[in-house]
């Protein structure tokens, strides 16, 4: 489950129309949310509030079972009003629980209007951990409608302090460009003098006005190819990885995502397949293989969403039209049979014409458009049901053949509180035990 400050950053991105799904860093989020979720350890309780539409603060207490109580203080400020912000009482669980990502790359790039030109938003975030007094901070500044600068910093106590250096400081710089067709990130990490470059390109989208317009502004399928390059100036170490992502909606409206990731330096290849079979269920699998060690692993997982007892459960399958209505529904008002000028000239002569073939081709074109429109309506109906469904809880489960562990996590809402609890079960035949267990409670106003 997203923490309070992570949720605020998500609200800021949605308000400023910044799509994180179009960045290489988040290309594997659909599978990672189910197969790599983090189980809370110990007990953690956080209380957050909003003093204004621009200022937010949070305080949390945590006990990891070592007899010591830790805490943190956080502050968040933005120049843009977060109109989509909701408290823990009113927030939908879809907004705070990581699950399948409905990737919808826009068909055009965003541009500022004259009124928005002077309103390039930015945010500031800071957190202090107690009693260690370690600190972390983040700043995001939107430079243009499709470019932003992100700065992250961490200051922690040095585990081996010296008279001249008792703290460790690390800064990270991100220059991100996000367009409908591609995205790019230039990264620098000060701790190891590490330089990085990420790039993601989307195939199959076109805004050429001469092309036939799409049936709907939503993309039924998207193929993306991305790569990242790293170079450590201090240790002279390179890094390289590339990922292919295909996300689509089937004819029944169920979204699916397939990814293929490769790291040639480490010799690792991994594939993931995720599909949302209905509004309540998502299935996911991942296969890893290493060419150097010949080791492999298979990980499978799922998440199950639940409604309240008194809530109206939406039907996961849209109601189809009656057969007679489907046969008669042809949008002729949008498509007319038009003969070119040269055909009109030929009609003056007495040459035989094959008008039946022309009419058949036009009819098939109309039927194809009709089928496409029905598919898009089905997809939109399925998507809206996911966004508007009154979920009350979600259960996540994954297991790995190599590690012999089963991870369980339950996330939900009780009154005005957001709850997250889970455990990790070790199924070793010699010594089966519980490796980890925790509970996290959040409240915001």
Swiss-Prot record:
Per the record, the GO terms for biological process are:
establishment of mitochondrion localization; mitochondrial genome maintenance; mitochondrial outer membrane translocase complex assembly; mitochondrion-endoplasmic reticulum membrane tethering; phospholipid transport; protein insertion into mitochondrial outer membrane
Q: Where in the cell is it found?
A: Mitochondrion outer membrane
| One GO CC annotation | ERMES complex
Question: What are the protein's UniProt keywords?
Answer: Membrane, Mitochondrion, Mitochondrion outer membrane, Transmembrane, Transmembrane beta strand
Q: How does this protein sit in the membrane?
A: Multi-pass membrane protein
Where would you say this protein principally sits, based on its record?
mitochondrion
Pfam families xrefs? MDM10
Q: State the superkingdom.
A: Eukaryota
Residue ranges that the Swiss-Prot or TrEMBL entry lists as coiled coil: none
Copy the domain comment: Lacks alpha-helical transmembrane segments, suggesting that it resides in the membrane via beta-sheet conformations similar to those predicted for other outer membrane proteins and porin.
Summarize subunit and interaction data from the UniProt record for this chain. Component of the ER-mitochondria encounter structure (ERMES) or MDM complex, composed of MMM1, MDM10, MDM12 and MDM34. Associates with the mitochondrial outer membrane sorting assembly machinery SAM(core) complex.
> Which family is this protein grouped under?
Belongs to the MDM10 family.
Described function: Component of the ERMES/MDM complex, which serves as a molecular tether to connect the endoplasmic reticulum and mitochondria. Components of this complex are involved in the control of mitochondrial shape and protein biogenesis and may function in phospholipid exchange. MDM10 is involved in the late assembly steps of the general translocase of the mitochondrial outer membrane (TOM complex). Functions in the TOM40-specific route of the assembly of outer membrane beta-barrel proteins, including the association of TOM40 with the receptor TOM22 and small TOM proteins.
> Know the name of this protein?
Mitochondrial distribution and morphology protein 10
Annotated organism of origin: Komagataella phaffii (strain GS115 / ATCC 20864)
């Amino acid at each position: 489950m997203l923490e309070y400050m992570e949720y605020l950053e998500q609200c800021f991105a949605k308000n400023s129309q910044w799509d994180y799904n179009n960045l290489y860093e988040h290309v594997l989020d659909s599978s990672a949310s189910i197969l790599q979720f983090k189980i809370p350890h110990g007990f953690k309780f956080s209380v957050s509030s909003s003093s204004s539409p621009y200022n937010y603060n949070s305080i949390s207490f945590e006990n990891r079972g070592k007899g010591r109580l830790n805490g943190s203080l956080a502050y968040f400020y933005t120049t843009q009003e977060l109109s989509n912000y909701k408290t823990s009482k009113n927030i939908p669980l879809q907004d705070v629980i990581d699950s399948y990502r409905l990737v919808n790359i826009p068909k055009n790039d965003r541009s500022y209007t004259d009124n928005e030109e002077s309103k390039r938003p930015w945010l500031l975030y800071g957190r202090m951990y107690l009693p260690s007094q370690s600190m972390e901070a983040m700043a995001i500044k939107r430079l243009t409608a499709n470019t932003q600068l992100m700065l992250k910093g961490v200051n922690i106590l040095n585990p081996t302090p010296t008279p001249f250096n008792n703290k460790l400081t690390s800064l990270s710089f991100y220059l991100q460009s996000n367009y409908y067709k591609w995205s790019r990130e230039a990264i620098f990490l000060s701790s190891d003098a590490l330089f990085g470059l990420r790039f993601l390109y989307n195939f199959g989208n076109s805004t050429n006005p001469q092309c036939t317009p799409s049936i709907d502004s939503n993309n039924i399928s998207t193929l993306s190819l991305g790569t990242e390059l790293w170079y450590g100036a201090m240790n002279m170490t390179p890094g390289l990885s590339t990922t292919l992502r295909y996300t689509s909606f089937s004819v029944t409206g169920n979204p699916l995502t397939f990814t293929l990731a490769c790291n040639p330096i480490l010799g690792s290849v991994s594939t993931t397949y995720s599909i949302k079979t209905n509004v309540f269920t998502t299935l996911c699998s991942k296969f890893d293989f290493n060419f150097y060690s010949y080791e492999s692993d298979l990980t499978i997982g799922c998440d199950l969403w639940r409604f309240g007892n008194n809530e109206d459960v939406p039907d996961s399958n849209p109601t189809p039209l009656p057969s007679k209505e489907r046969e008669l529904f042809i949008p002729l008002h949008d498509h007319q049979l038009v003969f070119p000028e040269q055909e009109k000239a030929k009609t003056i002569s007495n040459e035989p014409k094959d008008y039946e073939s022309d009419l058949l081709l036009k009819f098939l074109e109309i039927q194809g458009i009709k089928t496409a429109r029905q598919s898009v309506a089905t997809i939109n109906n399925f998507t809206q049901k996911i966004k508007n469904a009154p979920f009350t809880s979600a259960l996540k489960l994954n297991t790995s053949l190599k590690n012999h562990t089963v991870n369980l996590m339950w996330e939900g809402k009780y009154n005005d509180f957001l709850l997250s609890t889970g455990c990790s079960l070790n199924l070793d035949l010699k010594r089966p035990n519980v490796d980890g267990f925790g509970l996290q409670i959040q409240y915001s106003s």
